[in-house]
Amino acid sequence: MNAIMKEQFAAYPVETAMILGVAGGNGLEHIRTNKYRRVYGVDINSAYLDAVRERYPQLSGVLQCLHLDLLNEAEQLLQAQLVIANLLIEYIGYPAFQKAVLQINPEYVSCVIQINTDVEQWVSDSPYLHAFDRLDEVHHQMEEAVLSAAMQEIGYAEILRSTTVSLPNGKALVRIDYQKTRLHVQQSSYH
């Protein structure tokens, strides 16, 4: 995931980015302060955001952490040119993700989703498996075509689909990037 984030931060000619579900901040070391004016790290967990601030003091002039619940507070999201959402859509669902993207109004959206070929067991075997017992209540099975259709509905076209990285238990990570379509840019500039 770290290497993927490095690619995501470098991929597009942007100065602002928003990371939805920043968690503990893995991959933020790839933020180049000579490229980015502002990077927003969004998470529902304030302890994660505190850890990010402590872990990356060198980004204090660029990185701004936002404690928000994307399901209920998407209207508080600020605008950015790039949205990065890695392993997040599985937990908030397509409609909430669409709402967040529309609010942020980026030129580019870069997502990593986990594709599960074994639907019955989407959490990896671990001695701590019981800790995930209720995760089924918030986890949404991801499908590449459904995500791309959801993005197309809100005016974004797929521009990149990375090689799938195979993981244990029949899982894979897939990076899919989108760009705002020209028609959508023209329509949104009139509102």
Which residues does each predicted region cover?
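Class I SAM-dependent methyltransferase SAM/SAH-binding core
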Residues: 16-72
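Short conserved loop adjoining the S-adenosyl-L-methionine
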Residues: 72-78
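A short SAM/SAH-binding and catalytic strip from SAM-dependent methyltransferases
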Residues: 81-95
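Conserved beta-strand signature within the Rossmann-like core of class I S-adenosyl-L-methionine
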Residues: 106-120
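Short, glycine-/aromatic-enriched active-site segment of Class I SAM-dependent methyltransferases
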Residues: 116-138
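Short alpha-helix
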Residues: 135-155
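Core SAM-dependent methyltransferase catalytic element
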Residues: 161-191
